[in-house]
Amino acid sequence: MSEKSREYYTIARDLMPGGVSSPVRAIQPYPFYTVRGSGSRIYTVDGTELIDCCGAYGPLILGHACKPVGDAISSALDDGWLYGTPTPAEIDLAQILIADHPSIEMVRFVTTGSEATMAAIRLARGYTGKSDIIKTEGGFHGAHDGVLVQAGSGCTTLGQPDSAGVLSDIVRHTRQVPYNDTESLISLVDKSGDEIAAMILEPVMGNIGPVLPKPGYLQEVRKITAEHDILLIFDEVITGYRVGIGGAQKLFGVTPDITTLGKIIGGGLPLSAFGGKRKIMELIAPAGPVYQAGTFSGNPLSLAAGVAALREIHARKGMYTLLDTATTVIGEACQGKGGSFVKLGSMFKFFFRSSVPENYAQAKESDTTKFRAFWEKMLEKGIFLPPSQFETNFLSAAHSDSDVEYLSSAYASCLSA
C-alpha cells in the first residue's frame, strides 16, 4: 500500500514475531501502518485516508477520538494514571454496568477480554466444584489455554484453530458442541452433565462472522444448562453495548449466570469485566476463595474512558436505530451478488458462500480467495475492512450518511467486478 509501510514492516519482522503484536494484523504482503484516527477515518503513515469499518475490532462504537472520551482521558491524566488503590471511578463504572445488565449484581474489572473469560471459567469451577466446560466450535473466548480449541477469530484466519503448546491435559476438560445445535448439547449434558461447570457462549458469534442465533436457540440453551446445574456464561466482549444497551442478553431476553464484557466498556482503552449473581461473585478473592488479581485491573485512565463512553452512549438517543438502518442499506447493495449478507445492528459481514452460515463448519465453507480479492478492491477504494472472512465488520456512530452511501456503492461495484 505504501513504501513507508513496507519499510516499517521489514524492520518490525526483525523485532517482533511476524512483525506484529497480534496475528490478524499481519496483512500480506505487508500491513499498512496507521498514525491517526478521527471519526470514521484512519490515516496511514503516507497520509492515505481510509473509511474504517474495522473499528479496532469492535471497541470504537463512537468512532475514533470521540471528544467526550478524549476529554475524560486528558482530565484523568492530570491526576496521574496508576495508583494501585481503589478509585471512585470503579464505583461509577460498576454502577453503570449493573444498572444496564439485570443479570449482573456484582462486577470485577480486569484488563483484557481473555482475562475476563479466564476468570469467569475459574469462578464457575470454584462455584460448582465441577471441572469441565462447554464451548461452541469456532467460539473465540480469548487466548488462554482452556479455550484455544477450534477457536475462531485469528485462529481460523490463520488456519490454526488449535494452538501448539496447549496441553492435552488442559483441553480434555473443554467439551465442544456446534453453535445453533441444541440436540448435540442435550446429548452431551445428558451423558456428562455432572462433570460440567459451565457453558461459555458468544450469544452472537462475533469471531467467525457474525453468525446469529436461530430463533429460540439461546432460550433453549438457558433451559438446558439450568436443568443440569450448569452455569451459563455469556461472552459479551463483542456484543456488550454493540447490539444495544444491555447487550445480547437483553436483546434476546436470556439471563446468563455470568457475563464477560470488554471492548466498548473501555472507550478504546484496555478494560474488561466479568459479573454475575451476587452469590457467585462473592466467591472472588478477597471475599472468597477463587483468586483473581491484576496490577492494571481497574486502572484510572481506562475507567475514565469507559465511564465517559457509556455516558455518551446513553445520551445518544436513537444511535442504535441509526446504525441498524445503515447496515440495512449496505445489505441491500449486496443483494444478488453471489453470497450472503449477515447483520445485527452495527455488526455486518458479506460471506462468500451461497447461504447464511449457522455455525462454524458452514462459515468455514466461505471462499477465502474471493474474499481476499474483494478486500483488496475495497482497500483500493479507500475502505478498510477487517482483513479476514472470519472477522466481523463494525460501523460506528461517526459514520455519516455519505459514508454509508459510499460504502454501499463500493460493495455493489466490488462484488460485481
Swiss-Prot record:
It catalyses: (S)-4-amino-5-oxopentanoate = 5-aminolevulinate. InterPro entries: 4pyrrol_synth_GluAld_NH2Trfase, Aminotrans_3, Aminotrans_3_PPA_site, PyrdxlP-dep_Trfase, PyrdxlP-dep_Trfase_major, PyrdxlP-dep_Trfase_small. It is found in: Cytoplasm. One of its GO terms (biological process) is protoporphyrinogen IX biosynthetic process. The modification N6-(pyridoxal phosphate)lysine is found at K263. Keywords: Cytoplasm, Isomerase, Porphyrin biosynthesis, Pyridoxal phosphate. One of its GO terms (molecular function) is transaminase activity. Pathway: Porphyrin-containing compound metabolism; protoporphyrin-IX biosynthesis; 5-aminolevulinate from L-glutamyl-tRNA(Glu): step 2/2. GO terms for cellular component: cytoplasm. It holds the Pfam family Aminotran_3. Its cofactor is pyridoxal 5'-phosphate. The keyword Ligase does not apply. PANTHER family: GLUTAMATE-1-SEMIALDEHYDE 2,1-AMINOMUTASE (PTHR43713), GLUTAMATE-1-SEMIALDEHYDE 2,1-AMINOMUTASE 1, CHLOROPLASTIC-RELATED (PTHR43713:SF3). Belongs to the class-III pyridoxal-phosphate-dependent aminotransferase family. HemL subfamily. This is Glutamate-1-semialdehyde 2,1-aminomutase. It comes from Methanospirillum hungatei JF-1 (strain ATCC 27890 / DSM 864 / NBRC 100397 / JF-1). The lineage of its organism: Archaea, Methanobacteriati, Methanobacteriota, Stenosarchaea group, Methanomicrobia.
